């Protein structure tokens, strides 16, 4: 499911060292119909801009 993709992306991002809340906020901004890989890529772009 699409929300499953988002959950998977959030968990991958937390494994990379982001907090659950940072990852959730970034993932929430991304189209949930994308693949897990695409969601992660776009979330990383969002998160890297915040630093």
Region roles according to the model:
Residues 1-27:
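Strongly charged, low-complexity linkers/loops
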Residues 27-30, 43:
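A general structural motif at alpha-helix termini
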Residues 32-34:
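AAA+ ATPase "lid" subdomain C-terminal helix
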Residues 36-51:
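Amphipathic alpha-helical interaction/assembly segments
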């Amino acid at each position: 499911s699409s929300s499953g993709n988002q959950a998977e992306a959030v968990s991958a991002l937390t494994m990379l060292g982001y907090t659950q809340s940072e990852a959730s906020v970034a993932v929430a901004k991304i189209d949930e119909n994308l693949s897990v890989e695409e969601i992660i890529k776009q979330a990383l772009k969002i998160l890297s801009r915040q630093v």
